[in-house]
Amino acid sequence: MCWPPGMAWSRLGEPVWVDFNQGLDARLITPETASLLAGLHWIRFVRLSCDTSAMLPVIEQAAAYLREAGVAPSRLWAYVLVQDVPDAPRRVLALEKMGITPFAQPYRDYDGGEPPNEQKAFARWVNIRSVHNSCTWENYNDTRRRTRNGR
């Protein structure tokens, strides 16, 4: 049996379906690793993580490598850690401009406390696509956004 290079196969000769659900570190994606990743059967998305604005150029390069290797643009997806709300919209819009679907996650510290309402409202604006596509973050009017939960 001849398999494509980089394809993951089980011992029974069946393709292995993968899902790196915590987000791949874009800094580790080279043309070679992108080629290997493109050869995998993905359950859904190729997930990357964008915790800070400093990661945007790195993610842009990794996405280019993945596209060149044959990963469909519709499969590119990125977690956006929402800790600094004023910085988060810029990251979301930059990812969308790159053709990457963002998914906002409010920052939850180690004590397990609830994230601030502003972070949760931002995540709703990003993750509910109909809302996100209908208005900008600045024009998003969520009454829960206006109430502070003391954090």
Which residues fall in each region the model found?
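Auxiliary Fe-S-binding modules of radical SAM enzymes
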Residues: 69-71, 79-151
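Core AdoMet radical
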Residues: 1-62, 73-83, 101-106
